[in-house]
Amino acid sequence: MFTNRDEVLEKALRIFAKMNYEKASQMEIAKTCGLSKAGLTYYFPFKLDLFMAVADRYVFDTQHSKNKFNFTDGSLSEFIDQYIAGVENTMQRLVRLLDDGNNPSGCSFNFYYYHLLMQVRLYYPNVEQKIAAIFEQNHRLWKSAIHRAKENGEIRSDLDVEETALMFWQMFFWWRTMLLLRH
């Protein structure tokens, strides 16, 4: 059976999401991929290399605004609808990837992704900058939408763009977290 790098990443995503990083051995990952350990190390010499590649693809690339949202110029209401659609579509895509028919803990597949995020926070070197960049992207999106809404008269002219954008973003960040945890 021929296994390529993309297949290794997808199968490793499932393993890391359903197990702790420490518990997932290279041997188990290789077996799941239909490879020998040597075959796995051809693609990723160390488990951390594989974990970082999984995080880069399925956390950082997936959560990047250019991959998550399809905004068109419009009203604040349309922006909110497009933002929600982007979050929901992203989670549906991730759940489809994670749902391989194997659910050892009986958890929501959304929760497995949340579990992966916590591991990324613990094990990905210098992750703070990458997380901050995602947060900043979202904050800029909301600032831009609030600024446009203020200029177009959709919201009061005396509202502070920065504070209003933070309020909206924090509300949707909470909503997105609840979406991750729902069954």
Model feature map: region roles:
Residues 128-136, 150-183:
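Hydrophobic/aromatic-rich alpha-helical bundle segments in the mid-to-C-terminal region
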Residues 67-108, 161-168:
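Hydrophobic alpha-helical connector segments
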Residues 7, 11, 15-61, 72:
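Helix-turn-helix
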Residues 81, 105-115, 125-151, 163:
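Amphipathic alpha-helical packing segments from all-alpha helical-bundle domains
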Residues 44, 115-123:
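Short helix-capping/turn signature of helix-turn-helix
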Residues 54, 58, 62, 66, ...:
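Hydrophobic recognition helices of helix-based DNA-binding modules
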Residues 47, 54, 58, 62, ...:
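Hydrophobic/aromatic residues within well-ordered alpha-helical segments
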Residues 11-19, 65, 117, 167, ...:
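Solvent-exposed, amphipathic alpha-helical segments
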